[in-house]
Amino acid sequence: VYGMLFKFL
Protein backbone atom coordinates (compact mmCIF):
# COMPACT_ATOMS: atom_id res chain seq x y z
CA VAL A 1 0.00 0.00 0.00
CA TYR A 2 2.73 2.43 0.97
CA GLY A 3 4.54 1.87 -2.30
CA MET A 4 1.55 3.19 -4.22
CA LEU A 5 1.40 6.32 -2.07
CA PHE A 6 5.11 6.93 -2.50
CA LYS A 7 4.80 6.54 -6.27
CA PHE A 8 2.10 9.21 -6.28
CA LEU A 9 4.43 11.67 -4.54
Curated annotation (Swiss-Prot):
Tissue: Expressed by the venom gland.
GO molecular function (one): toxin activity
Localisation per UniProt entry: Secreted
A GO CC term assigned to this protein in UniProt: extracellular region
Protein keywords: Secreted, Toxin
Family recorded in the similarity comment: Belongs to the cationic peptide 04 (cupiennin) family. 08 subfamily.
Protein name: Short cationic peptide-4f
